[in-house]
Amino acid sequence: MDLKSKVFLIASIMTVFSTMVIPGETSAETTQNTVTITPINDEISLKKTVTTMNVPQDNKLPWGSVIGAPSEYVERYPVIIQFYSGEDPVHFAQVDVKGDGSFEYKFRVRNFDSNTGEFVNIFEGDYTVKIFRVIPNTEKFV
């Protein structure tokens, strides 16, 4: 590995660590969540959470994330995350639930184009984020 590659690698690592420490401007509104629970059968239901995400035009951070707090879950059912710009689907993801019922999905918001030497915003503006997870039924449905 030549000196230029080593310097680039070290600079990249330092950038990642610094972006993890500095709070970002990318936000998802948690006060305006819409939650719908639809029974699948007697034992499990599908919990759908709809929220919004805003990525400002002047964003400098490379990563965004969707994080779910520990809660009840059903084993072997992943969380499905869907991003929409208006009605247009933009990005879909599937992530496993951790043992405590939490989940985390990290995704690129900004990327470096090595051909042009410029940063490119992958996400910019307002998005609707739909999160689907399977939960155990707490009540019997008739």
Locate the predicted segments by residue.
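Ser/Thr-rich low-complexity repeats and stalk/linker segments
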Residues: 2-12, 16-142
